[in-house]
Amino acid sequence: MAEGVFSGAIGIDLGTTYSCVATYESSVEIIANEQGNRVTPSFVAFTPEERLIGDAAKNQAALNPRNTVFDAKRLIGRRFDDESVQSDMKTWPFKVIDANGSPMIEVEYLGETKSFSPQEISAMVLTKMKEIAEAKIGKKVEKAVITVPAYFNDAQRQATKDAGAIAGLNVLRIINEPTAAAIAYGLGAGKSEKERHVLIFDLGGGTFDVSLLNIAGGVYTVKSTSGNTHLGGQDFDTNLLEHFKAEFKKKTGLDISGDARALRRLRTAAERAKRTLSSVTQTTVEVDSLFEGEDFETSITRARFEDINAALFKSTLEPVEQVLKDAQISKSQIDEVVLVGGSTRIPKVQKLLSDFFEGKQLEKSINPDEAVAYGAAVQAAILTGSNLSDDTKDLLLLDVAPLSLGVAMQGDVFACVIPRNTTVPTIKRRTFTTVHDGQTTVTFPVYQGERVNCKDNTLLGEFDLKGIPPLPAGEPVLEAIFEVDANGILKVTAVEKSTGKTANITISNAIGRLSSEDIEKMVSQAEEFKAADEAFAKRHEARQRLESYVSSIEQTVSDPVLSAKMKKGAKSKVEAALADAFSALQIEESSAEDYRKAEIGLKRVVTKAMATR
């Protein structure tokens, strides 16, 4: 890579199943990886020798299911006891353990048992995306805009930002995926001067968002947003996998539930069948020797696939209804419905949505896999002020808080301070008081959600305001100030009005949050892993070079014509040097340097032996 640092920033769509990276240099470019693919699997695999990320990791998943990690986005910012984490764990071949309430992924790597946080796994994927960009740009990349589902809560946003820091990136902004896709649409096929209401329907591999925007010139105003951070293509695959599993059991009497390799192979076949059924109405599925020597062969129709996933497909319309209701807009006022995310290729999903909008033609002009990274790259260029075109220099994004924020009052009742769909950044205040006479400390538990009872919402963290004057209950005036930044991340301050005493919290001490020390430690670990990866690659290369050289010299020695050209008595020296090179290849612990020395040693002897007499 050329020296120097890229002055701009890259846009990264960190997806549940696939990720995508783009850069903006006078126009947007989606960058392909070394396999030539414009999307890279969000997979990380650990082996006794090395760590693999992306295509290489996904390609060996069936051979190494226990140590191939994916779906980190379904763990990030969640607690171990989260209902969705517990249900996902039943389908994942890798092990997830409880570390003080946070989920950690346990794998075997370099012959040891290691555990990684979801942030570290995501950081490995981000590092891969950063390297893909660096290979194209030819400079070191330090800054990025990373996208998250619009419906991600505070904990999930902060954890994604932390993953960026572990990957050595300065995360300039966390932006919402549907908003990024709206930029791609507004600058591309949807370019128009007139004001319009655009609904972005973003159904990806693991998450689902619906956002309603008003686009007027270069101003993108999000009116409302809704979604499900646990719905996507993976769930459709899982339902199909369960169907195939039951069919295999019926035919053979065998249950593959406990066999991680068979499950991975069948899941891959299910994913392939799902994709095929978007363009044909029937397909066959064949997996040779799936389990205990038994082959699996079946055919599946599009209608059956739709039936298996009917409830999930239908559930995608609920957030659509919600955003219209929240924005107080009727469906007839929506000018365009834009499809984003690979799962919107499913014909049934398109039909349900089109029918909901009275047969409206859906907007399929943008690439559903690349639109989010495209929008992120535009935002990255705006934030770094690099090479903006006329279209982008006046672009303004006004996004919203996806979920209400507030504190718990007596009786665990949720007191909302910032209602959902409030434009961010924002500052809101609300006054509270004491409930007991002489009370000098008040605890502020901060929650995010829409329910009246706090236990049904997400606890983001809590803090104490101490030193309140001991007055009768109800007299002290305590003001809670909620501040949400452009990343959708919250800071809360409480002030006692008569003394001016303050206490604050940037929600970062809740369960699963990483302290700056944790992040620093993970950054240095990430660098160590990267160094180990590089050392492994160098060793592998050096070994291959030595092997091919040894093999060519062996041929020379055994060829009577060629060996006759050697100096007298030199053949035995060459044979001895060959034996030394062989022993270097036999030693497991040989380093790249050992192989290099063995190759140089052998070359010297051969050169002397072949020197003209």
From Swiss-Prot:
Residues 1-391 are annotated as: Nucleotide binding domain (NBD). Coiled coil: none annotated. It is an enzyme of class 3 (hydrolase). The keyword DNA damage does not apply. GO terms for cellular component: cytoplasm; cytosol; nucleus; plasma membrane. It catalyses: ATP + H2O = ADP + phosphate + H(+). PROSITE patterns: HSP70_1, HSP70_2, HSP70_3. GO terms for molecular function: ATP binding; ATP hydrolysis activity; ATP-dependent protein folding chaperone; heat shock protein binding; protein folding chaperone. It is found in: Cytoplasm. CDD domains: ASKHA_NBD_HSP70_Ssb (cd24093). InterPro entries: ATPase_NBD (IPR043129), Heat_shock_70_CS (IPR018181), HSP70_C_sf (IPR029048), HSP70_peptide-bd_sf (IPR029047), Hsp_70_fam (IPR013126). Residues 392-402 are annotated as: Inter-domain linker. GO terms for biological process: chaperone cofactor-dependent protein refolding; protein refolding; translation. Keywords: ATP-binding, Chaperone, Cytoplasm, Hydrolase, Nucleotide-binding, Protein biosynthesis. Residues 516-612 are annotated as: Lid domain (SBDalpha). ATP binds at residues 16-18, 73, 205-207, 271-278, 342. It holds the Pfam family HSP70. A motif (Nuclear export signal) lies at residues 574-582. Residues 403-613 are annotated as: Substrate binding domain (SBD). Its EC number is 3.6.4.10. Belongs to the heat shock protein 70 family. Ssb-type Hsp70 subfamily. Ribosome-bound, Hsp70-type chaperone that assists in the cotranslational folding of newly synthesized proteins in the cytosol. Stimulates folding by interacting with nascent chains, binding to short, largely hydrophobic sequences exposed by unfolded proteins, thereby stabilizing longer, more slowly translated, and aggregation-prone nascent polypeptides and domains that cannot fold stably until fully synthesized. The Hsp70-protein substrate interaction depends on ATP-binding and on allosteric regulation between the NBD and the SBD. Binds to ribosomes. Binds close to the ribosomal tunnel exit via contacts with both ribosomal proteins and rRNA. Directly interacts with nascent polypeptides. This interaction is dependent on the ribosome-associated complex (RAC). Interacts with SSE1. Interacts with FES1. This is Ribosome-associated molecular chaperone SSB1.
